C-alpha cells in the first residue's frame, strides 16, 4: 500500500477493545483502483480479526482475506449496452471477471441481471443470487408528500430519472408529441452524461424540465401524475416503476429486460425503439379516466406488484439468503 499512496495518508487508530492500534487508510477504495490499474489484479486486505462476512454493495477491486466476500452487481449495462454509458466496458469486464472467480457469492437486484452474469461470465448459477431491492414509499413519506412543494402540474405524464440517452428521452419526447395529448410531459431528474434534445416537436407540446427537487416533492409529483412513462433502453432494476405503482399511478415501461420483469405484468409495455408504439400507448393512457375499469386494473395491479418490494418482503429475502449462506459455508458461519 505504501507504494500506492503517500505515507502521510496512512495513520494508526486506537482499537476499541484490544487496546492496541491498527493501520487506517482513509481512501482505501482509491488505493484499490490505483492498484488494479497498475497490477491488473484485486487488492486483498488482511486483518487480525476479519469479519465473518464482508458485504460489498458495489463491485470494487478489493476483497478481504479469510472472510466470506459477497459482491453486489446492480447491472451490466456498460457491457451489454456500451454505447449508453461513459463507463469503460473492458475495464469493468476485467474487474468482474476477477470478482466472479475470487469472491464467494455475487448478489444482484433482478433476475434479468442474474441471468446476464451467468451467461457472460460462465459462473455457476448457485453462486449468483437475486435479492431484488427495497423500493416503494414508506408511511412517513406518504404523510410528508401531501405538504411538499409542488414542482409538476397535476395530471401530467412524468418520467423520473437521469435525463440521458439511456432513458430514451428523445424518443419519449417525439412520441409524446405524436400522441396528440394536451397533458404536459415532465422530465424530473438530473442531467446525465449526454444532452438529449428536449425541444418540443409540435406547437401544442409542453415539455417541462425539473432538474432537482426534494424526495417529498418527487413523490408528490408522482402521485399527482396521470401516469409514469418510463421507456428506458436499459435498467438493472427500475426504481421509478415500483415507486409509481406503490402510489397507485399507472405505468408505461419497456418490454423486455429488467423493466418488464419489475413491472410484473402490471404495466403497459412498449417497444422502446418504436416511437409510434410509445405514442400509441401514451394516447391510450391519455384517454383513460381515473375510476374506469382499465384505469383501476392498472392501479390495483401496480399496488399489488409493489408489495413484492416492501421492507417486509426484503427482510424475508435477506433472511432466506443468510440461511442459504449457512448451508453453503457451514464451517465458516
Q: Where are the regions a protein language model picked out?
A:
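Carbohydrate transferase catalytic cores enriched for Leloir-type hexosyltransferases
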Residues: 1-333
Amino acid at each position: 500500500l505504501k507504494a500506492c499512496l503517500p505515507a502521510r495518508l496512512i495513520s494508526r487508530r486506537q482499537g476499541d477493545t484490544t487496546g492496541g492500534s491498527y493501520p487506517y487508510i482513509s481512501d482505501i477504495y482509491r488505493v484499490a483502483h490505483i492498484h488494479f490499474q497498475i497490477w491488473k489484479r484485486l487488492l486483498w486486505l488482511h486483518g487480525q480479526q476479519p469479519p465473518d462476512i464482508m458485504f460489498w454493495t458495489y463491485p470494487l477491486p478489493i476483497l478481504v482475506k479469510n472472510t466470506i466476500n459477497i459482491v453486489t452487481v446492480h447491472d451490466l449495462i456498460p457491457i451489454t449496452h456500451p454505447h449508453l454509458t461513459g463507463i469503460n466496458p473492458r475495464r469493468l469486464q476485467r474487474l468482474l471477471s476477477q470478482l466472479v472467480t475470487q469472491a464467494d457469492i455475487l448478489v444482484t437486484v433482478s433476475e434479468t441481471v442474474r441471468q446476464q452474469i451467468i451467461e457472460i461470465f460462465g459462473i455457476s448459477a448457485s453462486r449468483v443470487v437475486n435479492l431484488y431491492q427495497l423500493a416503494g414509499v414508506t408511511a412517513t413519506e406518504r404523510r410528508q408528500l401531501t405538504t411538499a412543494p409542488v414542482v409538476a402540474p397535476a395530471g401530467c405524464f412524468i418520467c423520473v430519472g437521469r435525463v440521458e440517452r439511456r432513458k430514451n428521452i428523445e424518443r419519449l419526447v417525439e412520441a409524446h408529441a405524436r400522441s396528440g395529448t394536451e397533458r404536459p410531459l415532465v422530465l424530473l431528474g438530473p442531467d446525465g452524461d449526454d444532452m438529449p434534445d428536449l425541444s418540443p416537436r409540435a406547437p401544442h407540446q409542453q415539455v417541462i424540465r425539473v432538474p432537482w427537487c426534494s424526495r417529498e416533492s418527487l413523490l408528490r409529483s408522482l402521485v399527482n401524475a396521470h401516469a409514469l412513462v418510463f421507456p428506458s433502453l436499459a435498467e438493472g432494476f427500475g426504481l421509478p416503476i415500483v415507486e409509481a405503482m406503490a402510489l397507485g399511478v399507472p405505468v408505461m415501461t419497456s418490454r423486455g429486460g429488467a423493466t418488464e420483469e419489475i413491472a410484473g405484468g402490471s404495466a403497459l409495455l412498449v417497444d422502446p425503439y418504436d416511437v409510434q408504439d410509445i405514442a400509441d400507448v401514451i394516447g391510450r393512457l391519455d384517454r383513460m379516466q381515473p375510476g374506469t375499469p382499465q384505469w383501476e386494473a392498472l392501479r390495483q395491479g401496480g399496488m399489488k406488484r409493489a408489495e413484492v418490494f416492501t421492507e417486509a418482503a426484503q427482510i424475508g429475502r435477506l433472511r432466506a439468503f443468510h440461511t442459504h449462506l449457512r448451508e453453503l459455508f457451514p464451517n465458516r458461519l
